[in-house]
Amino acid sequence: MGEKKSSSAGKSLAVRKSRHKNCLSEIPPTPDNEAIGIIASLSPPFARRQTIMNNLSHAIDALIAYAREKLGLSSRNAVYARNTVLGLVGAQSYEDSGAVYDGREVSDLLSDLVNACAEAGLPAAEQPERLTDGVMGALMLSPEAVEEAFAAHMRVSSAEATRWLYDYCVHADYVKKKKLDANPRFTAENGLIVTINCAKPEFRDPKKAASGNSVRGGYPACTICRENEGFVGRNKCTLRTVSLELGGEPWFWQFSPYGYFHEHGIAVNQKHIPMHVDRDTFVRLMQFVDLFPHYFIGCNAPLPRIGGSVLAHDHYQGGGEVLPLHRAPIAVPLSHPDFPEIRAGVIDWQGTAVRLSGKNADQIADLSERVRVAWCAYEDAARGLIPVDGDGVHHAVSPTVIKTQNGYEMNLILRSNITSAQYPDGVFHAHPEFHVIKKESIGLIEAQGLFILPGRLVHELADLEALLISGAPLPEQYADYAMLFAEMKAMSPAFTPQSAHEAVKTELASVCSRILKNTAVFEAPSDTAQFLIRKAGFTYGK
């Protein structure tokens, strides 16, 4: 009987050996020395698989804990959210890791998730942006819940409401604040703000830059339609918008993921209609600052080369930063006999801009419309100012508004997109000698003195600094910088690392100022004043 038991035990062990080769999860506990040896030989791959699963579970749990802390995820919805994330990553198993929020930034937590998915061989890791956008969208409040929370904050103050929404979008990783904070930025002595946007692609080809101007159909119709909210195809699962009413019509507000300034966002018409500027535009802009007096708001000129990249859909840009144009003084005071309550003047500015100030919104809208109509019909062939020709309309106004203790301050920037044989990209655009710094359209934000320069400049300007320090000649690859490099070299007989860096910053600010001057449709403020007096009925003021 004893021998039979021994034989049976041997067969049982043999069966266990066979099973162990194919199913690591079925290893039973046993004191048998041979079985222990088998387990020991199999433990490295088993432990590796267990580690991979633990890493993935930990990454998911850390994000759930983060969402509980920062995104308003309730305990009731936590399990549902976790299962949704498991489905998004394609995981087949999960073990509670007990992870808690440790204070790290969401971008780091998402990197952990992508790395864990890659380690586990999950296909979701091959599209990291889509994966992270989908995961964060699943952890966020719904659009309706965000709208309700925003409305609750609005009952306290509009500043609190926009601050809450902006912070929420940062926490959700829709606004890429970590990347934005890494962008080089400085305020120059001439008052201009210069930034290098490393997160934004450069469109040196105007046709490519204008790709957002035409409607190609499909769904959503363009990149800023409200139907993008939650749309996976454009990685908009984390987009959240809030409703506005402007001019008695439905609009909405959303923050820009790659903003150029503090709390940069856009107000978008609910209807997909082309950009345009008329009296109603001025009214809506002032209504916006009535709602959000801590913001400025403006509208790009609705024409290619001097407007934004999405002219097919009516929208405005604004945010919580006072831009250089808003700080600029009046060079030529003006008044208008039909609007005695409105203070007016030509702004002391490199471009061509007019300021109208007062507390009566209707009067400011009326006078703004007079300026717009006068400018859009103005012709001066000697200066190349042609309002309309066979290529279409060329004159437009870019309005921008802030609210002060004196009421509304409407700044009207006069623009022209006319071209010529000498200036095929635009007579009143950055001239060719400056294209190495900025060739893209000079839109609303730059026209107000905040320049967004391409990311390639980080490395190119660092190379120029090194050349200044060493005294080496400009290599052929940087031939386009010849004029600017000569101007930098003329600033000092010799350069230290610090003085070379300052020389580059000084040159950048000078170039940006000259580009703004290129956009000026009149040579001097006095010329602008004469236009307003002759064509729009203004008189000289005090």
PLM regions with names:
Residues 12-14, 18, 27, 33:
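Intrinsic disorder/low-complexity segments enriched in small, polar and charged residues
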Residues 239-242, 270-297:
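Helical scaffold of the NTase/Pol beta-like nucleotidyltransferase catalytic core
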Residues 280, 289-309, 318-372, 376-379:
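Catalytic or ion-translocation cores adjacent to nucleophile or general acid/base/metal-coordination motifs
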Residues 28-35, 39-43:
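Intrinsically disordered, low-complexity segments enriched in serine/proline and basic residues
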Residues 49-267, 271-274, 350, 364-365, ...:
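Active-site microenvironments that recognize anionic phosphate/pyrophosphate groups
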